[in-house]
Design a protein with these regions (language model features):
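Short, charged, low-complexity amphipathic alpha-helix
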Residues: 1-12
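A short acidic (Asp/Glu
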Residues: 105-108, 129
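Short active-site neighborhood of thiol/selenol oxidoreductases, capturing the structured segment around
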Residues: 50-71
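Thiol-based oxidoreductase modules, predominantly thioredoxin-like and allied folds used
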Residues: 88-103, 114-125
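Thiol/selenol-based redox catalytic cores and closely related redox-interacting motifs
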Residues: 119-198
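Hydrophobic small-molecule pocket/channel-lining residues, especially in calycin-type beta-barrels
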Residues: 69-72, 82, 117, 130-134
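Conserved helix-turn-beta segment immediately C-terminal to the redox Cys motif
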Residues: 68, 75-95
Length: 198
């Protein structure tokens, strides 16, 4: 297939994706909110409630991050760091991990992260939201593990509700690296993210 023909075919497929995106937005607008409890996390300055993470915003994004041992989660967080100020102008944004605040501080400093972080260690937040798989679960892989994702919350009627969530992973809508690599004929070609590059 010629270059021009291939680009034309790709453009048609991308147009289909835009149509699907519009359908997703329509579904999202009709969501029935899920009430959630006011979880208490360990913040960098002490205990902090989910409701306090909103600050002066009505909307809040919480990133479910697997912690300092995950190269993939780290790359996603690096990307969020790049757009943090844009997001924070519209909604509150917080990254939650199972690490202690001291570990978070050290790791965030090493990455140059600017967004707020909380620890969900010792809480039921991650499993309640569907971002921890226990041994025996369908995708538990024989043991318990954290799962990466993002949840969107809103303050409504004096409480907190979840209005959306989705997993994070290669080729999702939230990490541009994979989409750029997909423009190469070989795609990622086995490439994986690293904590540091030579």
């Amino acid at each position: 297939m010629t270059y021009a023909d291939t680009m034309s075919a790709l453009q048609a497929k991308r147009a289909q994706l835009l149509t699907l995106h519009d359908e997703i937005r329509t579904l999202q607008q009709g969501v029935e909110p899920q009430p959630v409890e006011d979880y208490v996390f360990e913040g960098w300055d002490g205990p902090v409630k989910l409701s306090q993470l909103f600050g002066d915003k009505r909307d809040l994004f919480v990133i479910h991050n697997m912690g300092t041992t995950c190269r993939y989660c780290t790359m996603w967080a690096d990307g969020f760091n790049g757009v943090y100020e844009h997001l924070a102008d519209r909604a509150a944004f917080v990254l939650s991990t199972p690490n202690t605040p001291d570990v978070q501080k050290q790791f965030a400093r090493s990455r140059g992260w600017r967004f707020p972080m909380v620890s969900h260690a010792g809480t039921t937040f991650a499993p309640d939201m569907g971002y921890r798989l226990e041994k025996g679960d369908e995708f538990g892989e024989g043991g318990s593990r954290w799962v990466p994702g993002v949840s969107a919350f809103q303050k409504r009627d004096g409480g907190v509700v979840r209005v959306s969530d989705t997993d994070l992973g290669p080729s999702d809508d939230f990490c541009s690296v994979w989409h750029l690599l997909d423009m190469l004929p070989e795609g990622p070609a086995g490439w994986e993210p690293k904590f540091r590059y030579a």
